[in-house]
Amino acid sequence: DRNLQFIIRINVDNDNAKSIGKILDYFEELGLKGKLDVYLAPVRTMNGQCNNEKCFAEKEFADTEINFIKIGLEKGYDFLELPECNLGICGAVSQNCYVINAKGNIFKCLNDIAKDECKIGDVLHPLDCENEKFVEWISYEIPDECKECKILPICMGGCPVLRRKEKKACPAVKYNYQKLLQLVNEWSKKEYEK
Protein backbone atom coordinates (compact mmCIF):
# COMPACT_ATOMS: atom_id res chain seq x y z
CA ASP A 1 0.00 0.00 0.00
CA ARG A 2 1.59 3.25 -1.10
CA ASN A 3 -0.65 5.77 0.65
CA LEU A 4 -1.63 7.45 -2.57
CA GLN A 5 -4.49 9.88 -2.34
CA PHE A 6 -6.88 9.99 -5.26
CA ILE A 7 -9.22 12.89 -5.75
CA ILE A 8 -12.01 12.47 -8.27
CA ARG A 9 -13.81 15.47 -9.66
CA ILE A 10 -17.26 14.78 -11.05
CA ASN A 11 -18.52 17.43 -13.44
CA VAL A 12 -22.29 17.68 -13.09
CA ASP A 13 -25.08 19.31 -15.03
CA ASN A 14 -28.86 19.07 -14.93
CA ASP A 15 -28.76 15.76 -16.81
CA ASN A 16 -26.24 13.69 -14.88
CA ALA A 17 -26.77 15.14 -11.39
CA LYS A 18 -29.66 12.74 -10.88
CA SER A 19 -27.19 9.84 -11.02
CA ILE A 20 -24.56 11.05 -8.57
CA GLY A 21 -25.43 8.35 -6.05
CA LYS A 22 -24.83 5.64 -8.65
CA ILE A 23 -21.21 6.67 -9.15
CA LEU A 24 -20.60 6.28 -5.43
CA ASP A 25 -22.09 2.78 -5.61
CA TYR A 26 -19.80 2.04 -8.56
CA PHE A 27 -16.72 3.19 -6.63
CA GLU A 28 -17.75 0.90 -3.77
CA GLU A 29 -18.16 -2.05 -6.17
CA LEU A 30 -14.60 -1.41 -7.37
CA GLY A 31 -13.34 -1.44 -3.78
CA LEU A 32 -12.47 2.25 -3.86
CA LYS A 33 -14.67 3.44 -1.02
CA GLY A 34 -12.43 4.97 1.63
CA LYS A 35 -9.51 5.21 -0.79
CA LEU A 36 -10.50 8.36 -2.62
CA ASP A 37 -11.97 11.78 -2.15
CA VAL A 38 -14.78 12.80 -4.44
CA TYR A 39 -16.13 16.25 -5.15
CA LEU A 40 -18.53 17.86 -7.59
CA ALA A 41 -17.89 20.72 -9.97
CA PRO A 42 -20.52 22.37 -12.13
CA VAL A 43 -20.30 22.06 -15.90
CA ARG A 44 -19.86 25.56 -17.28
CA THR A 45 -20.04 27.08 -20.73
CA MET A 46 -16.49 28.43 -20.51
CA ASN A 47 -15.65 27.97 -24.17
CA GLY A 48 -19.13 27.92 -25.67
CA GLN A 49 -18.90 24.20 -26.46
CA CYS A 50 -21.69 22.95 -24.22
CA ASN A 51 -25.40 23.59 -23.91
CA ASN A 52 -26.04 26.39 -21.43
CA GLU A 53 -29.51 25.02 -20.61
CA LYS A 54 -27.93 21.95 -19.01
CA CYS A 55 -25.71 24.05 -16.73
CA PHE A 56 -26.73 24.86 -13.19
CA ALA A 57 -27.37 28.33 -11.85
CA GLU A 58 -25.08 28.99 -8.87
CA LYS A 59 -27.73 28.34 -6.21
CA GLU A 60 -28.96 25.19 -7.97
CA PHE A 61 -25.47 23.75 -7.92
CA ALA A 62 -25.10 24.66 -4.24
CA ASP A 63 -28.20 22.57 -3.47
CA THR A 64 -26.93 19.71 -5.65
CA GLU A 65 -23.62 19.74 -3.80
CA ILE A 66 -25.33 19.49 -0.41
CA ASN A 67 -27.50 16.65 -1.72
CA PHE A 68 -24.39 14.83 -2.97
CA ILE A 69 -22.70 15.16 0.42
CA LYS A 70 -25.83 13.81 2.16
CA ILE A 71 -25.97 10.84 -0.23
CA GLY A 72 -22.28 10.19 0.34
CA LEU A 73 -22.66 10.25 4.12
CA GLU A 74 -25.65 7.89 3.91
CA LYS A 75 -23.53 5.49 1.84
CA GLY A 76 -20.69 5.62 4.37
CA TYR A 77 -18.32 7.95 2.56
CA ASP A 78 -16.48 10.47 4.70
CA PHE A 79 -15.58 13.23 2.28
CA LEU A 80 -17.39 15.89 4.27
CA GLU A 81 -14.96 18.73 4.81
CA LEU A 82 -15.25 22.37 5.59
CA PRO A 83 -13.91 24.70 2.92
CA GLU A 84 -10.40 25.95 3.57
CA CYS A 85 -8.75 29.29 2.96
CA ASN A 86 -7.66 29.63 -0.64
CA LEU A 87 -4.54 31.73 -0.48
CA GLY A 88 -3.51 30.91 -4.04
CA ILE A 89 -6.77 31.93 -5.74
CA CYS A 90 -5.95 30.23 -9.04
CA GLY A 91 -2.72 29.16 -10.68
CA ALA A 92 -3.60 31.24 -13.73
CA VAL A 93 -3.05 34.47 -11.82
CA SER A 94 0.26 33.42 -10.31
CA GLN A 95 3.49 34.29 -12.05
CA ASN A 96 4.90 30.77 -12.27
CA CYS A 97 1.95 28.60 -13.29
CA TYR A 98 1.35 27.70 -16.92
CA VAL A 99 -0.59 25.29 -19.08
CA ILE A 100 1.03 23.83 -22.19
CA ASN A 101 -1.12 22.29 -24.91
CA ALA A 102 -0.16 19.48 -27.29
CA LYS A 103 1.21 21.98 -29.83
CA GLY A 104 3.61 23.46 -27.28
CA ASN A 105 1.68 26.70 -26.90
CA ILE A 106 1.69 28.23 -23.42
CA PHE A 107 -1.42 29.55 -21.72
CA LYS A 108 -2.26 30.81 -18.25
CA CYS A 109 -5.64 29.07 -17.96
CA LEU A 110 -6.67 25.51 -18.78
CA ASN A 111 -9.94 26.81 -20.23
CA ASP A 112 -7.99 28.63 -22.95
CA ILE A 113 -5.84 25.82 -24.36
CA ALA A 114 -7.95 25.49 -27.51
CA LYS A 115 -7.93 29.23 -28.21
CA ASP A 116 -4.84 30.30 -30.12
CA GLU A 117 -5.70 33.94 -29.48
CA CYS A 118 -5.20 33.36 -25.74
CA LYS A 119 -1.70 31.91 -25.91
CA ILE A 120 1.03 33.84 -24.13
CA GLY A 121 3.94 32.08 -25.79
CA ASP A 122 5.33 28.71 -26.80
CA VAL A 123 7.93 26.29 -25.51
CA LEU A 124 10.41 27.08 -28.30
CA HIS A 125 10.83 30.74 -27.38
CA PRO A 126 11.54 32.64 -24.14
CA LEU A 127 8.39 33.90 -22.48
CA ASP A 128 7.80 37.63 -22.90
CA CYS A 129 6.80 38.78 -19.41
CA GLU A 130 5.61 42.06 -20.87
CA ASN A 131 3.14 40.24 -23.11
CA GLU A 132 -0.22 41.98 -22.65
CA LYS A 133 -2.12 38.73 -22.02
CA PHE A 134 0.46 37.56 -19.47
CA VAL A 135 0.37 40.88 -17.61
CA GLU A 136 -3.42 40.85 -17.61
CA TRP A 137 -3.41 37.49 -15.81
CA ILE A 138 -0.78 38.24 -13.19
CA SER A 139 -2.20 41.67 -12.37
CA TYR A 140 -5.51 40.16 -11.26
CA GLU A 141 -7.00 41.92 -8.26
CA ILE A 142 -9.82 40.83 -6.01
CA PRO A 143 -12.91 42.80 -7.04
CA ASP A 144 -14.11 45.49 -4.66
CA GLU A 145 -17.56 43.89 -4.27
CA CYS A 146 -15.86 40.77 -2.88
CA LYS A 147 -13.81 42.52 -0.22
CA GLU A 148 -16.69 42.66 2.28
CA CYS A 149 -17.96 39.13 1.59
CA LYS A 150 -17.82 36.69 4.51
CA ILE A 151 -16.45 33.88 2.34
CA LEU A 152 -13.65 35.90 0.72
CA PRO A 153 -10.91 33.83 2.42
CA ILE A 154 -12.40 30.72 0.80
CA CYS A 155 -12.82 31.92 -2.77
CA MET A 156 -10.60 35.02 -3.06
CA GLY A 157 -12.91 36.46 -5.69
CA GLY A 158 -13.57 33.22 -7.52
CA CYS A 159 -12.46 31.98 -10.90
CA PRO A 160 -10.78 34.82 -12.80
CA VAL A 161 -12.17 33.56 -16.13
CA LEU A 162 -15.73 33.49 -14.85
CA ARG A 163 -15.19 36.87 -13.27
CA ARG A 164 -14.19 38.31 -16.65
CA LYS A 165 -16.98 36.63 -18.60
CA GLU A 166 -19.89 36.86 -16.20
CA LYS A 167 -18.73 39.55 -13.76
CA LYS A 168 -19.56 37.12 -10.96
CA ALA A 169 -17.80 33.96 -9.85
CA CYS A 170 -19.23 33.04 -6.48
CA PRO A 171 -18.68 29.41 -5.43
CA ALA A 172 -21.42 27.14 -4.12
CA VAL A 173 -20.26 27.59 -0.53
CA LYS A 174 -21.56 31.16 -0.60
CA TYR A 175 -25.06 29.75 -0.93
CA ASN A 176 -24.80 26.51 1.02
CA TYR A 177 -22.38 27.19 3.89
CA GLN A 178 -25.15 27.14 6.51
CA LYS A 179 -26.42 23.77 5.27
CA LEU A 180 -22.84 22.54 5.09
CA LEU A 181 -22.17 23.58 8.70
CA GLN A 182 -25.38 21.87 9.76
CA LEU A 183 -24.27 18.66 8.00
CA VAL A 184 -20.85 18.83 9.65
CA ASN A 185 -22.50 19.30 13.04
CA GLU A 186 -24.88 16.36 12.54
CA TRP A 187 -22.12 14.11 11.19
CA SER A 188 -19.75 15.05 14.03
CA LYS A 189 -22.39 14.17 16.62
CA LYS A 190 -22.95 10.75 15.00
CA GLU A 191 -19.21 10.08 14.86
CA TYR A 192 -18.81 11.13 18.50
CA GLU A 193 -21.60 8.78 19.59
CA LYS A 194 -19.95 5.75 17.93
Short names for language-model regions:
Residues 113-194:
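Flexible mid-to-C-terminal extensions adjoining Fe-S/redox cofactors in radical SAM and related proteins
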Residues 26, 39, 77, 98, ...:
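Sequence-level detector for tyrosine residue identity
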Residues 1-95, 102-103:
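Radical SAM enzyme [4Fe-4S]-AdoMet core and its adjacent flexible, acidic
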